[in-house]
């Protein structure tokens, strides 16, 4: 086996032994000739089998990134890097979806913004002792375009600091 790149070592560190074994089993099913690589065509099938759902565009972009030598094939280490990337993307998408749901709940009047009254309600609902000054400070810090309310992008930025 060729020496691992930093990316490949990172990918292995991110995954449990069980996951690596599961990915290897799926990979091997499509490595028909046992040569240690699969064609880019088979890649989508393998990823779907492992619960990933890349679009055609995502697949093309992934393949372009991963198939550095342009051989049209991907070896197992390249495959691991790609799967980890995809898993992280999916996780990011999920947390953004959860935050969108929170935003909708916090945006009581459904105008697409969280105003200072709504922000105050949210903070008081946590049970923490919150002063008007605390609420105003958070609004000031979060309201990047200074329109007196928090839009969804500002909310995402605000929540990045929380997680």
Curated annotation (Swiss-Prot):
InterPro entries: CALM/Myosin/TropC-like, EF-hand-dom_pair, EF_Hand_1_Ca_BS, EF_hand_dom. Keywords: Calcium, Metal-binding, Muscle protein, Repeat. Ca(2+) 4 binds at residues 143, 145, 147, 149, 154. One of its GO terms (biological process) is skeletal muscle contraction. Pfam families: EF-hand_7. Skeletal muscle troponin C binds four calcium ions. Troponin is the central regulatory protein of striated muscle contraction. Tn consists of three components: Tn-I which is the inhibitor of actomyosin ATPase, Tn-T which contains the binding site for tropomyosin and Tn-C. The binding of calcium to Tn-C abolishes the inhibitory action of Tn on actin filaments. This is Troponin C, skeletal muscle. It comes from Gallus gallus (Chicken). The gene is TNNC2.
